[in-house]
Amino acid sequence: MSRRQMSFPWTCIAAAAVVLAGCGGGGGGSASNPTSNGGNPPASNPPYELPDPASAPALKDSYGGYFRVGGAIEPSQLQVASDANLLTRHLSSLTAENAMKPQTIAPTDPSQSGYVFGPADELVAFARSHGMAVRGHTLLWHFGAPQWFFEGPKDSDPVGYRNLVRQRLEDYITDVVTHFKDDVYAWDVVNEVASDASGAIYRTDSPWYQAFSVGGGDGAEYIEIAFRAARAADPNALLFINEYNTELPAKRANLLAIVDDLISKGVPIDGVGHQLHVSLDVSTHAVSDALTAVEQRNLINHVTELDISIYLDPSTCAAVRASPPCIADYGTSPPASVLAAQALVYRALYNVFKDHDASVESVSTWGIHDAHTWLTSFQGRTNSPLLFDHQRLPKAAFWAIVDPAFAIKTST
């Protein structure tokens, strides 16, 4: 997960265009929901009737023949009965939203003894008791690692400095992976290491890249080191490189260049994680292309952080909410037409995942219901990007992916 602007690919899902006037990030809201209303949320259409929630099939049963069905959670949600019930009924896999990241596990001061495993251990125990798998997220990324990882004699002894940082990295990964050995079946070893820019392969603003670049070192070396340390600590765990915007050709090219380099060096990498934080205009063809590219390298595909933002407006709105025209906050009851558009996109994406079921072994959403989503805090307006609504009830998007006969109404 990153603090970044949402991606807005170039092409639209044709079905979604039925209910949305303009696709692509340039022009504001949908035809049925104009935003020239003084900044107030557009009037919601009455939602059309959905099937009885009690009749909802379990997601893990609907897709068990294709791939694991997962979701990212905070351990505190396990104490909320409605959340725990959703998890145990619908999911076969759990991901820690933050509890397995370095900023949670690693001590903030190197003089402190021990790691903070408690929250992650709680999640693992819950998963084990309910027969669920656990994906580990993440051993390393550019955000959140305590500063002491990178302290040392950069100027006076650059080679010694790089070796010191390397040892800290290897020790940390070894300790964490060993702690969760036999409980975590797959790890996002490195997260968001590819550059967004054309002509630059690696994310060079990462403190890890910068540390390994000191004194003319190979800034990208930390990626190989991380994978080798993880494999040594748990030979049975699947090891992934996890990235956002893999559906965008330029970003995907950078990621694949990294993957190809790792493969050429014999680095133990098992698959690619596709975050897929997308919007209503995502190109399913582009998503399919991303999955195909991984298949061509004989690697596994995991969809790791899926959500679909209901706001289709300039990407600057996601960051600063200051570049008009921006869609006003829908609140917790988005227009039915927007939810229908979202349902069409979810159905199209899950059809793509099924088409690639030979390589897609896991599909996880980043959250389980709309009352708990990073997009609301990140964008500063209420988002509803998941399969269950703010009351934990199945949305049109849910019914769209579990029932091919469910008619998605594009008008009310």
Language-model features, listed with the residues they occupy:
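Structural preference for beta-strand elements that scaffold enzyme active sites
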Residues: 66-70, 93-95, 133-135, 184-188, ...
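Short, solvent-exposed loop/turn elements at domain surfaces
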Residues: 76-83, 101-106, 373-374
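Bacterial Sec-dependent N-terminal signal peptides
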Residues: 3, 13, 17-55
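Generic structural signal for well-ordered alpha-helices
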Residues: 56, 91, 120-127, 169-177, ...
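Noncatalytic carbohydrate-binding groove/subsite architecture in carbohydrate-active enzymes
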Residues: 59-66, 74-84, 204-325
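Boundary/entry segment of secreted carbohydrate-active catalytic domains
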Residues: 42-93, 97
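Aromatic-rich peripheral "rim/lid" segments of glycoside hydrolase catalytic domains that contact
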Residues: 106, 179, 188, 192-216, ...
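Substrate-binding cleft and catalytic face of glycoside hydrolase catalytic domains
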Residues: 89-110, 118-246, 310-314
